């Protein structure tokens, strides 16, 4: 039986493994050493206050999926929204309802905490993810344009200084 619960500090290595698998899914070519990734996970999720949160789907002792999220403010009025950064289910658990369980847990978390909405993105080429969200009955919003600035080694500050 698959269960969903908040991640705990003892889960950091399992989260690191899922994120490594996620990176391979997106054809990432670089990976940081495991101890550094675990340190980043602990710093992001298990400090007070946390910068991010994670829900894990479990099949007994096996981790069957991850939903990583943060809160954004302001949303509608002075409310906040829950931003789902990653929903990831390894191949072995796909098409078994794990993603739906994680999404329902995300929606329940948002409702319990008084969020006015849940938001997320998916890659334009990830047709399977788009079909999954459509099956959930979630409409696509095309009213926003997404921007991203990445640190390419010269530091994000170079953009602020006009050195792009």
Predicted feature residues:
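Conserved GNAT-fold acetyl-CoA-binding loop/helix
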Residues: 16-43
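A conserved beta-turn-beta hairpin within the catalytic core of GNAT-like acetyltransferases
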Residues: 73-84, 94, 141-142
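Conserved acetyl-CoA-binding loop-helix of GNAT-fold acetyltransferases
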Residues: 89, 95-108, 131, 135
């Amino acid at each position: 039986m698959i269960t969903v619960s908040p991640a705990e500090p003892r889960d950091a290595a399992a989260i690191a493994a899922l994120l490594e698998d996620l990176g391979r899914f997106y054809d990432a070519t670089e990976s940081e050493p495991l101890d550094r990734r675990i340190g980043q996970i602990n710093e992001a999720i298990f400090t007070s206050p946390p910068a991010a949160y994670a829900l894990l789907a479990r099949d007994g002792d096996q981790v069957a999926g991850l939903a990583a999220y943060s809160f954004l403010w302001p949303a509608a009025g002075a409310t906040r929204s829950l931003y789902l950064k990653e929903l990831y289910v390894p191949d072995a658990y796909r098409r078994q309802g794990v993603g739906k369980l994680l999404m329902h847990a995300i929606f329940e978390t948002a409702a319990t905490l008084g969020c006015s909405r849940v938001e997320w993105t998916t890659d334009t080429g990830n047709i399977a993810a788009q079909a999954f969200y459509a099956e959930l009955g979630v409409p696509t919003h095309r009213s926003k344009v997404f921007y991203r600035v990445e640190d390419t080694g010269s530091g994000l500050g170079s953009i602020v200084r006009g050195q792009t």
